[in-house]
Amino acid sequence: MTTTAKTDDIPIDTVILDIEGTVCPITFVKDTLFPYFIEKLPSILDKFQYPLSNTSASSDDQVLNILKQLPDNITKSSESIYKHFKNLVDQDIKDPILKSLQGLIWKQGYEKNELQAPIYQDSIEFIESFPTKSSTNNKIYIYSSGSIKAQILLFGHVKSTTTTITNEVIDLNPKLNGYFDITTAGFKNQSNSYKKILQEINKSSTPKSVLFLSDNINEVNAAIEAGMKSYIVIRPGNPPIDDDDDGNDDKINHKIIYSLDELDL
């Protein structure tokens, strides 16, 4: 069942956006970012001596400091580290150490222009227009399982869809008010994570003025449980919306949109 996404009760002045499957094709993460990380990982790991437990306690190398957060049985060799991270990627496990390392490797790719984020045009237009659409100082935040560094990189290297100039990118970060990930807010299928975000953005007393958009029904349910408004976003290539974690086919009770153009805010 599809319903028109109109506001009710308290007007919405704050929007929190999920990334993959919501403002960006889900295929970009799984078919571009993840393979890029796996491709570059061996050469990154080859820079160090193993086992890492024998290295000095402190280092200025960001990658090394991330790797040393792993258990000693994993850091005994570059092969064991590679196998560990590849397994996490293959199973799409939201591991904080993995996310931090991915962020650093993706940073190199963005800076070399080997990576550009294919944000949907309707999402670009919404991010550019919503903050100035009202005199009430509308705000936009990002909440993703990817690290905040990775989020900033992604929105700082958005592929332009309105120009014929090769490799031209748009920086949307000036339009965004903040970022949250699983290390700063918690896992996205838990209502306490959204309550924490409400506290951070000073919206605990008016949670209904906050709208969270996601393609994941469990995340939508968690946001609603925390008091926010939340809509399901359906995009081309997204997997079918299954029952929630409790086995309930309650998507018919949610507002569904197929483009951010449908938002009446």
From Swiss-Prot:
Gene3D superfamilies: 1.10.720.60, HAD superfamily/HAD-like. Keywords: Amino-acid biosynthesis, Cytoplasm, Hydrolase, Magnesium, Metal-binding, Methionine biosynthesis, Nucleus. It is found in: Cytoplasm; Nucleus. It catalyses: 5-methylsulfanyl-2,3-dioxopentyl phosphate + H2O = 1,2-dihydroxy-5-(methylsulfanyl)pent-1-en-3-one + phosphate. The gene is UTR4. Pathway: Amino-acid biosynthesis; L-methionine biosynthesis via salvage pathway; L-methionine from S-methyl-5-thio-alpha-D-ribose 1-phosphate: step 3/6; Amino-acid biosynthesis; L-methionine biosynthesis via salvage pathway; L-methionine from S-methyl-5-thio-alpha-D-ribose 1-phosphate: step 4/6. Its EC number is 3.1.3.77. This is Enolase-phosphatase E1. It is an enzyme of class 3 (hydrolase). Binds 1 Mg(2+) ion per subunit.
